[in-house]
């Protein structure tokens, strides 16, 4: 038996044993409670980084802990394997996307297996496998049958040189194509959408059910859904028999409308534009069409607009207001038209100032209008007194309506409802509930994705691919040039097919699905991952779901998590699931940060200097000798501050890496990588190793503990059961792994100071090894076998603490004189207030400080202190 901890000698051996015993396999249904532990599956980039290691370590601790608590656990792994990088690799390196992806999967699987994670690899799936995307396509057809999938025109990024559609990440900050350098245009193409808006209300309301989710994630989703209640108002257009419909959450400001704004894409744009303005408007629309949605709505850029020459009538005042077109109004949002109220909206105020438009204040602070007659008139558009206020910026606070006809003098809060009711009576408006959420555009003009399983027939229209013909497989003999759109459009042998309904020559859909589709249901496939006959056996999935603990980054707070919730609800409504929400509890782990140095931006880009090139005592740029900023930042190649997992593991072992990751910071916080702290965890595991091996070598007593324990034994037993209670609560309730490991350190310290011949010591050694097992599984299992056990430690039952053992015979009583601590004594734990005062008075400490003084008052805080107030 080696007296020194040698991780390299035990880790591979332990992993081999776990594999032979099948410890990680998902058990069948039984009377045991279930626990589904899941980390967000990775994109197979080919290289594991420390962020991955942290994510999967957290989930692994939970899975191991729950197994030892008697749960049947599923802890699977898969690959989010479709996506743009594989196509780029095909273009740049001539490697087919499938080959590149599967090579990366093989490499990353080996890296993950090296970590010794308790993953059931028999559940493994890859979204790019036909065995998986067959069912992704089947789910698409379920959406189509339910009326939740449809086509309409939508704008895409278009490279005019390469004649191809670009993803947002392929467009640089200057609006140029990453490959050709061409100025990217916006182009309308017919695209597929999912009607997620049909579920907006339920997605919003059911956030209240997610009691195990971080509040900030729920708030982010609520804001993304963006429910608001406001008014739908119609403004007649002068000269044509049309009305401009606007949606506003501020109907109380309608008397302050000084212009209307249409989105450039609005269908009324051409009709309201006068001949005099037509040429200028067309130029403006062309310019805006080449801007991304992000550019148009950015808070950092000034808003641009142009008058159409057309005018509309404010139905409340009868006054004419000019109609403008502006880049910041998007047709997909609301009605594609907004009313401009610069007096009471910050954005409108800036726009009006820029274009010299009227600013009409119709709400004011009560203090500012205290001397005015604000009695409303009987005429809805009349005013009793023109109230002038001199605000230097938009007034956006609640207030009193002024210059607002019959609504003058009432609060802006009350005016909202009153104005909507009036508009409804006059038939030019109504109350409306609106959502910021828009339908989900799922079309991608790319090759490496799940083909959309429909056929376009000139006679029958859109025809679903029959279930028996699924999957619609991606063709393999494809040339990747990065030009002329998706390679699928060029393959006539693949595109041209007979219509399944009438037999007429027809064409396949050449768009593929957004990769978020694949990740919106993968967690439902894991419990029945090898099912070839159906998407999954509902009885199995309903048994295992929902996921009890989901772990992943905050960057997925909105899209992935929202889409997964949407899919779950749709499949429930299709009769496949019997639950409403997919993820019971969510943990968003922090980033892993590494030390780096920064030479701040001085007219150019920030310059990152790797720490290995810098003298930490006097950090300076090695090229310019300028002083550098020392900081921790998210690990990346550009910053040169990454730490390769394999380097840490080869030097310290897997368990040390796990212990550092778990101890350094709470899981939801960012973690700063510090090798000194890694070494600290390595020393701790060495101490545990020596404690156990010294105990074994010494051959000390292992007889069962007797009821008649010495004072020291009682204290040791209390330390043991305090550790059991604390570690259990830290892992089970809040996932405070760092404080759990602190408790393990306290227990090891207590054992180091204890009598090695005591039977309680034997209990403590075995308890320490069991408690450390979820955190450092290799060393724990090895020590368990060295203790003479034949079974794996990971099959042991998690210990329960004995409440009686936690009760101390004695407590520490602090002695104070005039509120100042003078020392402490040990007293019986059950002593009452009178006894505590007696012990304190008789103590040597009190005698020393109160001798010769008159005691005026004694304050006793039971279980804590006695304070003497003296003259």
From Swiss-Prot:
Location of the motif 'KMSKS' region: 634-638
Signal sequence range: none
Residues the record lists as binding ATP: 637
Keywords on record: Aminoacyl-tRNA synthetase, ATP-binding, Cytoplasm, Ligase, Nucleotide-binding, Protein biosynthesis
Keyword Ligase: yes
Localization per Swiss-Prot or TrEMBL: Cytoplasm
Motif 'HIGH' region location, chain numbering: 42-52
Catalytic activity annotation: tRNA(Leu) + L-leucine + ATP = L-leucyl-tRNA(Leu) + AMP + diphosphate
GO molecular function: aminoacyl-tRNA deacylase activity; ATP binding; leucine-tRNA ligase activity
EC number, UniProt record: 6.1.1.4
PANTHER family, alphabetized: LEUCINE--TRNA LIGASE, MITOCHONDRIAL, LEUCYL-TRNA SYNTHETASE
Family indicated by similarity: Belongs to the class-I aminoacyl-tRNA synthetase family.
Protein name: Leucine--tRNA ligase
């Amino acid at each position: 038996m080696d007296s020194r901890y040698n991780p390299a000698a035990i880790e591979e051996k332990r992993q081999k044993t776990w594999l032979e015993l099948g410890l990680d396999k998902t058990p069948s249904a039984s009377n045991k409670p279930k626990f589904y532990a899941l980390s967000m599956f990775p994109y197979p980039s080919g290289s594991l980084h420390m962020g991955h290691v942290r994510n999967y370590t957290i989930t692994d601790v939970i899975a191991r802990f729950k197994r030892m608590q008697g749960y049947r656990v599923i802890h699977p792994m898969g690959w989010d394997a479709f996506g743009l990088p594989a196509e780029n690799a095909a273009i740049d390196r001539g490697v087919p996307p499938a080959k590149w992806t599967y090579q990366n999967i093989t490499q990353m699987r080996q890296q993950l297996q090296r970590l010794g994670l308790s993953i059931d690899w028999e559940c493994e799936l890859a979204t790019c496998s036909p065995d998986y995307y067959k069912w992704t396509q089947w789910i698409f057809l379920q959406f189509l049958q339910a009326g939740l999938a449809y086509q309409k025109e939508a704008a895409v990024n278009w490279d005019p040189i390469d004649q191809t559609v670009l993803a947002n990440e392929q467009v640089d900050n200057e609006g140029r194509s990453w490959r050709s350098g061409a100025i990217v245009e916006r182009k309308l193409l017919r695209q597929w959408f999912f009607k997620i808006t049909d579920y907006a209300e339920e997605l919003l309301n059911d956030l209240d059910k997610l009691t195990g989710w971080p509040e900030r994630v729920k708030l982010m989703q609520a804001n993304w859904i963006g429910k608001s209640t406001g008014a739908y108002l119609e403004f007649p257009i002068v000269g044509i028999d049309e009305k401009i419909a606007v949606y506003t959450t501020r109907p109380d400001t309608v008397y302050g409308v000084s212009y209307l704004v249409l989105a450039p894409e609005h269908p009324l744009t051409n009709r309201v534009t006068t001949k005099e303005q037509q040429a200028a408007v067309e130029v403006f629309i062309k310019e805006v069409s080449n801007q991304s949605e992000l550019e148009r709505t950015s808070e950092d850029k000034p808003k641009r607009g142009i008058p159409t020459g057309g005018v509309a009538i404010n139905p409340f005042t009868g006054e004419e207001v000019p109609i403008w077109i502006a880049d910041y109004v998007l047709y997909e949002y609301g009605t594609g038209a907004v009313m401009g109220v610069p007096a009471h909206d910050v954005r409108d105020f800036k726009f009006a100032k820029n274009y010299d438009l009227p600013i009409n204040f119709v709400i004011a602070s009560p203090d500012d209008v205290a001397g005015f007659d604000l009695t409303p008139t009987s005429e809805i558009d009349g005013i009793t007194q023109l109230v002038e206020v001199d605000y230097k910026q938009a007034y956006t606070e609640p207030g009193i309506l002024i210059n607002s006809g019959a609504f003058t003098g009432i609060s802006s809060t009350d005016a909202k409802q009153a104005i909507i009711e009036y508009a409804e009576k006059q038939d030019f408006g109504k109350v409306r509930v609106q959502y910021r959420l828009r339908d989900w555009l799922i079309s991608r003009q790319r090759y490496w994705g799940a083909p959309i399983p429909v056929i376009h027939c000139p006679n029958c229209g859109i025809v679903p691919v029959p279930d028996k013909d699924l999957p619609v497989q991606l063709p393999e003999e494809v040339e990747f040039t990065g030009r002329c759109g998706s390679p699928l459009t060029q393959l006539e042998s693949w595109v041209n097919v007979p219509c399944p309904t009438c037999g007429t020559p027809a064409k396949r859909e050449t768009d593929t699905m957004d990769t978020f589709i694949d990740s919106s249901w993968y967690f439902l496939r894991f419990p029945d991952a090898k099912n070839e006959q159906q998407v999954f056996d509902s009885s199995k999935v309903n048994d295992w779901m929902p996921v009890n603990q989901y772990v992943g980054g905050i960057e997925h707070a909105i899209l992935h998590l929202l889409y997964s919730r949407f899919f779950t609800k749709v499949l429930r409504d299709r009769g496949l699931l019997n639950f409403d929400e997919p993820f019971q509890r969510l943990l968003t782990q922090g980033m892993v940060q590494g030390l780096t140095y920064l030479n701040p931006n001085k007219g150019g880009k920030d310059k990152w200097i790797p720490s290995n090139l810098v003298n930490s005592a006097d950090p300076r740029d090695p090229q310019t000798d300028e002083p550098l900023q020392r900081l921790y930042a998210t690990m990346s190649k550009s910053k040169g501050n990454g730490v390769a997992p394999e380097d840490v593991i080869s030097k310290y072992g897997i368990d040390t890496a796990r212990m550092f990751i778990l101890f350094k910071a709470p899981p939801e916080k960012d973690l700063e990588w510090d090798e000194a702290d890694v070494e600290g965890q390595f020393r701790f595991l060495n101490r545990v190793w020596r404690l156990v091996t010294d105990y074994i070598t010494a051959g000390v007593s292992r007889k069962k503990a007797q009821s008649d324990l010495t004072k020291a034994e009682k204290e040791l037993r209390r330390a043991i059961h305090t550790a059991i209670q604390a570690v259990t609560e830290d892992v089970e309730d809040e996932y405070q792994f760092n404080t759990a490991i602190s408790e393990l350190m306290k227990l090891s310290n207590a054992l180091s100071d204890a009598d090695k011949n005591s039977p309680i010591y034997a209990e403590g050694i075995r308890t320490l090894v069991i408690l450390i097992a979820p955190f450092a599984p290799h060393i724990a299992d090895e020590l368990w076998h060295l203790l003479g056990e034949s079974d794996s430690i990971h099959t042991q039952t998690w210990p329960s603490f004995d409440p009686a053992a936690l009760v101390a015979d004695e407590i520490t009583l602090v002695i104070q004189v005039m509120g100042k601590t003078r020392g402490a004594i040990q007293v019986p734990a059950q002593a009452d207030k009178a006894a505590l005062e007696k012990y304190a008075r008789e103590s040597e400490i009190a005698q020393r400080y109160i001798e010769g003084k008159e005691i005026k008052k004694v304050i006793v805080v039971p279980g804590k202190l006695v304070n003497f107030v003296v003259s």
